[in-house]
Amino acid sequence: LDELTDQGKTIIFITHKLGEAMHAADDVTVLRDGENVGSVDTDDATREELAELMVGREVILETDKAERPPGDVVLSVDDLTVTDDGGYDAVADMNFDVREGEVFGIAGVDGNGQSELIEAVTGMRTPDGGRVVFDGTDVTDRSRREHIERGMAYIPEDRQEEGLVMEFDLVENGLLGNQHTDPYADTGGIDWGATRGHAEDVVSEYDVRPPDVEAEAHSLSGGNQQKFVVGREFSRDPSLVVASHPTRGVDIGSIEFIHDRLLELRQEGKAVLLVSSKLDEVRQLSDRLGVVHEGEIVDVVDPDAVTEEQLGMLMAGEEPTSVPQMAARAGTGAPAGGGSR
């Protein structure tokens, strides 16, 4: 883009990403709810001012993560090996655990085994070796339904392919994953009154717009689709949340909202496994951060101390000169990561 502007070209650049807008544009015009709400010169405006224009209220861009000692282990991944659809090892002998009141982050360049790892952890792909232990039970070969019934919530990487049925309305989409559980289902079939009430609660609590549970999922913006998926999953009162790229393709206001909800669960003592390719996201939210490269956790680092340059080198499979390590976990005597270094 810089080369094109140097050649005298005029560029119209459309994005909902705050950083991109501030970096790439000279002037930014903000559209909100279909209306022009203002224009700013990026040399004079701050990120906070632009975010407020975009959302219509003050947005907290820096996440405040309260101190909280972790509790017992909720999820253990032991020597896990998973092959991809082509028969190649996407995950190789991976080890880590996630504890109560902890966000364990996974950082890496997309395509380094994250998708296959999440599928194995959530019961959607059978591993080729190793174990997944959830709340003390080996669930390696258990169904997705059993994972849900045991208290695992899942925010999928692709909300439109895995999280929603786009032709269903929000009442029907709110039932997904709950179709076998009380109070939404019993021996007589689906209780549509309870199901509708559940969808209305999610729409209200998570500020899904438009606030119409009869709206079909495809009619919602990406951010509102994601907020509905997050609300449905969190409403299960899970002991573990597996969040795969939870803010991909959503606006800055929705990002703030989802981050706040994840940290609220952490503060309540829930365990969170977070996978994201956004370095600022995993660094802000995680208590410990596992870095993956070619299907292996190459290191587990302190997200508050590691630099973006060090993370980038680890993600590329290179060895930084010095990386801040996590201390041994209380009560285990084990290193914090369980990675391969």
Predicted regions and their residues:
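Glycine-rich phosphate-binding loops of nucleotide-dependent enzymes
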Residues: 1-341
